């Protein structure tokens, strides 16, 4: 199951390992009106709950767990990432707005790289070798971050208190308590 979308100012290509819905979950995935395109590598753990919530509100085209990303985007625009529980790296292209969103899961389980060519065009890929030869510079796409084409920059979307030193500076640190907790 490999697929390619080429339109507007975006090209999305995907080679799929099918675990959930291997028969009809080919990618890229499309919104019902075909205006939003999604290439994703990942697993959305809460996809059943999201599907249930959107029953009757969104016309799911496949049984793919990742299709819920399209339903969430339809309702929330780019502000839906907090609603996902899972591991993922994706590129979503809205052909009507000619905008794209690239995002990676909070801890970076799924690999993703971003690159820029000499004209400033943006590329992303799950393997670094896919960017070589096209990009003048490239770097790892940071976990818990997204890139929205309208803003043209990387933004941290996954923000928790415990990720800031000030929030945990006074927390007791005990190697023996940690060891005991891990051994249980």
Please place each PLM-identified region on the residue numbering:
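Cysteine-centered catalytic environments shared across enzyme families
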Residues: 1-184
């Amino acid at each position: 199951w490999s697929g390619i979308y080429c339109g507007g100012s975006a090209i999305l290509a995907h080679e799929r390992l099918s675990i959930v819905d291997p028969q009809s979950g080919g990618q890229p995935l499309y919104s019902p009106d075909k205006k939003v395109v999604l290439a994703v590598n990942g697993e959305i753990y809460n996809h059943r709950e999201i599907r249930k919530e959107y029953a009757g509100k969104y016309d799911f085209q496949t049984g793919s767990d990742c299709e819920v990303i399209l339903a969430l985007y339809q309702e929330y625009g780019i502000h839906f990432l907090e609603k996902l529980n899972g591991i993922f790296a994706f590129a979503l292209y809205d052909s009507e707005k000619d905008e794209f969103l690239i995002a990676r899961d909070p801890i970076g389980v799924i690999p993703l790289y971003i690159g820029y060519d000499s004209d400033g065009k943006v590329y992303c890929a799950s393997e670094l070798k896919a960017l070589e030869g096209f990009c003048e510079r490239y770097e790892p796409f940071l976990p818990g971050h997204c890139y929205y084409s309208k803003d043209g920059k990387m933004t941290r979307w996954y923000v928790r208190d415990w990720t800031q030193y000030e929030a945990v500076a006074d927390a007791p640190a005990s190697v023996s308590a940690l060891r005991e907790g891990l051994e249980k």
